[in-house]
Amino acid sequence: MAKKPSLSPEEMRREALETALSTIERKYGLGAVMKLSDEAHVAIPVIPTGSIGLDLALGVGGVPRGRVTEIYGPESSGKTTLTLHIIAEAQKRGGTAAFIDAEHALDVAYARRLGVNTEELLISQPDFGEQALDIADMLVRSAAVDLVVIDSVAALIPQAELEGSMGDTQVGGQARLMSHALRKLTGTIHKSRTAVIFINQIRMKIGTMGYGSPETTTGGNALKFYSSVRMDIRKIQTLKDKEEVYGSRTRVKIVKNKVAPPFREALFDILYGTGISRTGEIIDLGSDAGIIDKSGSWFAFGSERLGQGKENVRALLEENAPLREAIEAKLIEHLGMTPTKFASSGEEPANDEENDL
């Protein structure tokens, strides 16, 4: 009987690692462990975010279906604006979206300006946290809703706290509520392929004494653990025309990603009244990629001069849709953003190359 050739120590280590990785994937699913340089990501259906840069940073072309996503940041950082764009993208693809407005603060006119079909949007304004999460659970279980947004975790107040006296303390009530709800929701979300987005706020920790970040999110630790994607959104610059403020430069950092390598960032402009400026992104990303030639403050696309200054070019491209679409198509091709599968809620994703992006 021929002897099995002996393996070198390096080959034995590599074989042991491959065995461990395959065991982890069998137990916890594809994507539980990956290299930061991996290009082959988990093939799952997604809902685009409305931002080219953010879709690229997420690694799969948008917010994953059948998963929990958390979007958090300081006040007025663009959290609700981003989720309204995601709702609009879902509706464009024939999907059904629900917005659970626990804060009772949704601006319907603003949502409409961002492209949301408010007549088809399911809206709930629950009285307490248990009601909000129960409604979310029933919508997910129906397998007929593609996207559920809960705005926000901080407003999910337990019923016992609302019915108690003003001075009563309910220590950990919200954290227990979130932990119980997410244990119940997670399996159903995966089966129905519904994308569930929780909007969250930031609070300051007490007594950190300079060690670690002083910031934390509300609702305990359960949402951190159950989320497949966590996005930190921040306003980093105010956009002004002389003295008039017309928007903000916004950065989104992917602080957790179980479907692609994390820690990537996206930058885009949020313009007051109109939301994320896709045209602005085309200019920025196109210039970085060399598709748009930038010489000083002048911009050109091939032999065609676009204008001087980003705002002038933005105005030109907003008016000239064919030119904007030509630049965008070339940019998407350059970035290698492959077509994504949307897939209706409850539908198994097909293994084809259908272009729903």
Curated annotation (Swiss-Prot):
One of its GO terms (cellular component) is cytosol. ATP binds at residues 73-80. Pfam families: RecA, RecA_C. GO terms for molecular function: ATP binding; ATP hydrolysis activity; ATP-dependent DNA damage sensor activity; damaged DNA binding; single-stranded DNA binding. The keyword Ribonucleoprotein does not apply. InterPro entries: AAA+_ATPase, DNA_recomb/repair_RecA, DNA_recomb/repair_RecA_CS, P-loop_NTPase, RecA-like_C, RecA-like_N, RecA_ATP-bd, RecA_C_sf. Keywords: ATP-binding, Cytoplasm, DNA damage, DNA recombination, DNA repair, DNA-binding, Nucleotide-binding, SOS response. GO terms for biological process: DNA recombination; DNA repair; SOS response. It is found in: Cytoplasm. Can catalyze the hydrolysis of ATP in the presence of single-stranded DNA, the ATP-dependent uptake of single-stranded DNA by duplex DNA, and the ATP-dependent hybridization of homologous single-stranded DNAs. It interacts with LexA causing its activation and leading to its autocatalytic cleavage. Belongs to the RecA family. NCBIfam families: tigrfam_recA. This is Protein RecA. The gene is recA.
